[in-house]
């Protein structure tokens, strides 16, 4: 008796998970050599979370507004620029606007565009396998955050960053890669200069930490819990309640089904703030070559009900 398409998909996922579990032993944080970049990343993360602990003692209403601005500007920089524009080339904008959006993403303190885009492209190339940079098969906390602090493991899995030659050819992205730390330090200094500890703890603390964890939830939670609408060979899920906070990124099953789509909230009721921005830019003539899934693609990927 032949298996249905859905049964075959479930079997393939189980086999892939079993293979990953057998083929790669989870490595504890203390069981490997820490590279200098790992230490810098870990220190930065600890510092941001330390600022969060100080934030309640430095609360002001202007500081809360700064936190919301940092969260929004940095978050949209990640979703609109790093993710949809640079990683997937789902739309085009003039270079001055592309570079501006990318700089907004830099302020989210999630790395420079070359580093972020390369990791994300490897995630789609090796989704849920033992070569996935933040594979959910290695545990929730690994896929959520711990993978960030093991760059040697990332190289072991994926090799060198050879999948971002389009960005490496541009002086601007190479400049940001070389100087990312100086931009972050300047950002922190400006927050302190204009608002003291209140702006620093709420802007670089609360604002940045919230955006970090929302982004991390896309890698962890959205491969564990939620609904599936499309036949993808992975564990991607749609998590509706995270859509507002993630600016539309949590329609993750939609995204894995149609990676190059500029729109991830494919239904009218699926909130996707990043798409609203891209659509507005398209209406006023600044965004071109905006990619969306065709009806034939949607029919081919739809779950059998």
From Swiss-Prot:
Q: Which residues bind Fe cation 1?
A: 83, 88, 120, 124, 255
Q: Look up the record and report any one GO term of the cellular component aspect.
A: endoplasmic reticulum membrane
Cofactor(s) of this protein: Fe cation
Q: Where is this motif: Histidine box-1?
A: 83-88
Q: Which UniProt keywords apply?
A: Chloroplast, Endoplasmic reticulum, Fatty acid biosynthesis, Fatty acid metabolism, Iron, Lipid biosynthesis, Lipid metabolism, Membrane, Metal-binding, Oxidoreductase, Plastid, Stress response, Transmembrane, Transmembrane helix
Please provide, alphabetically and separated by semicolons, the GO molecular function terms listed in this UniProt record: metal ion binding; oxidoreductase activity, acting on paired donors, with oxidation of a pair of donors resulting in the reduction of molecular oxygen to two molecules of water
Expression induction: Down-regulated by cold.
What are the binding positions for Fe cation 2 in this chain?
Answer: 123, 223, 252, 256
InterPro entries, alphabetized: Acyl-CoA_DS (IPR015876), FA_desaturase_dom (IPR005804)
Where is it expressed, tissue-wise? Strongly expressed in inflorescence meristems, leaves, and flowers, and weakly in roots and seedpods.
Tell whether Transmembrane is among the UniProt keywords. yes
> Which parts of the chain span the membrane according to its record?
39-59, 60-80, 180-200, 268-288
What does the record note as the disruption phenotype of the gene behind this chain? No visible phenotype under normal growth conditions, but mutant plants display enhanced freezing tolerance upon cold acclimation.
**In which residues does the motif Histidine box-3 occur?**
252-256
Indicate how the chain sits in the lipid bilayer: Multi-pass membrane protein
Chief site of localization: endoplasmic reticulum
The short motif Histidine box-2 is annotated over 120-124
Q: EC number(s) per UniProt? A: 1.14.19.-
Q: Where in the cell is it found?
A: Endoplasmic reticulum membrane; Plastid, Chloroplast membrane
Role noted for this protein: Involved in delta-9 desaturation of fatty acids. Involved in the production of very-long-chain fatty acids (VLCFAs). May desaturate chloroplastic monogalactosyl diacylglycerol (MGDG) and alter chloroplast membrane fluidity, which is required to prime a cold acclimation response.
List, alphabetically, the PANTHER family matched: ACYL-COA DESATURASE, DELTA-9 ACYL-LIPID DESATURASE 1
Q: Which family does it belong to?
A: Belongs to the fatty acid desaturase type 1 family.
Q: What is known of its domains?
A: The histidine box domains may contain the active site and/or be involved in metal ion binding.
Q: What is this protein called?
A: Delta-9 acyl-lipid desaturase 1
Q: Which organism is it from?
A: Arabidopsis thaliana (Mouse-ear cress)
